[in-house]
Amino acid sequence: MANSGLQLLGFSMALLGWVGLVACTAIPQWQMSSYAGDNIITAQAMYKGLWMDCVTQSTGMMSCKMYDSVLSLPAALQATRALMVVSLVLGFLATFVATMGMKCTNCGGDDKVKKARIAMTGGIIFILAGLAALIACSWYGHQIVSDFYNPLVPMNVKYEFGPAIFIGWAGSALVLLGGALLSCSCPGSESKAGYRAPRSYPKPNSAKEYV
């Protein structure tokens, strides 16, 4: 039968990773202005996220502007946004399903085998959520690297990795690991066999027979 400690560890890791994915999706620091070469900006720092771009002054004040048009955004940014939204929705669904299937909860009935299968289903959904987020962050990171080493892109508009993309990678890893631990909670074949009555063997005939 599934180990409740393993289930709790996997669920905690997956939930923590999902919270990290929510945070990285919301904050605008997916890429930040580069300081390579002669592109040294001391008065302000520029950030770009999935939904807005921001400028932070040397005084600490930040001003942000939402993207005006969805159709004018690059294809990589639109795909990243879509994958992150899918990841968050799957993570929310996986949290609900896994909670019902964990041994330490009273949801999902008293059938331990059924609850273990529900927890395994939640783990699989967590894995799908982690994969979607990992693909999104890696795709976005690849685009940053391509633009950084593109000689046609001026130095004053080059960007580097921001904190959000590292949070996304870490969150994806936690969600994947947590989902894998939850998926290992599937009951073994011994739990499916159920109770078997002991076999009864015929008693040996006695040496003497009485009439």
From Swiss-Prot:
Gene Ontology cellular component terms for the protein in this record: basolateral plasma membrane; bicellular tight junction; plasma membrane
GO terms of biological process kind: bicellular tight junction assembly; cell adhesion
Region (Interactions with TJP1, TJP2 and TJP3): 210-211
Protein topology in the membrane: Multi-pass membrane protein
Protein keywords: Cell junction, Cell membrane, Membrane, Phosphoprotein, Tight junction, Transmembrane, Transmembrane helix
Cell location: Cell membrane; Basolateral cell membrane; Cell junction, Tight junction
Pfam families documented for this protein: PMP22_Claudin (PF00822)
Record note on modification: Phosphorylated.
Stretches assigned to the Extracellular side: 29-81, 139-160
Entry keyword annotation includes Protein biosynthesis: no
InterPro entries in the cross-refs: Claudin, Claudin7, Claudin_CS, PMP22/EMP/MP20/Claudin
Gene Ontology MF, one: structural molecule activity
Bilayer-spanning residue ranges: 8-28, 82-102, 118-138, 161-181
Residues exposed to the Cytoplasmic side: 1-7, 103-117, 182-211
Disordered: annotated span: 190-211
Complex and partners: Directly interacts with TJP1/ZO-1, TJP2/ZO-2 and TJP3/ZO-3. The phosphorylated form interacts with EPCAM.
Family statement: Belongs to the claudin family.
Role: Plays a major role in tight junction-specific obliteration of the intercellular space.
The protein, known as: Claudin-7
